[in-house]
Amino acid sequence: MSHTILLVQQQVKKPESRVWADYETLNQCLEGVCKIYEEQLKQQNPTAPTITYDISQLFKFIDQLADLSCLEFHPATGTYVPHTKDWIKENIYALLRNQAGQ
């Protein structure tokens, strides 16, 4: 369990589109990225009773973000380690694969 800060900028050249969130664990942060996408889908489809998507659609959403990164706290060093979009995508894939296997 390590504190993780998620940094998101949705549009290029629009600093006002920057948001951040903090999570108690890395997995909560990765799930938070999925929830951001799910919220966008709900806004685009307000009358849909359910929202479904596949991982390629989620990754396309992540790729179109101007910036997405997270800072994961490492207690041993007392520092936050930055992670890129690609790292986040790899770990979301592993998380979802693990959840699907349960």
From Swiss-Prot:
Coiled coil (UniProt feature): none
Species this chain originates from: Echinococcus multilocularis
Keyword Transcription regulation tagged: no
Annotated keywords: Cell cycle
Described function: May have a role in the cell cycle.
Family: Belongs to the E(R) family.
Pfam families: ER
Subunit record text: Homodimer.
Gene name for this UniProt entry: ERH
Keyword Cell division among record annotations: no
InterPro entries (UniProt xref): EHR_sf, ERH
Organism domain of life: Eukaryota
Name under which the protein is recorded: Enhancer of rudimentary homolog
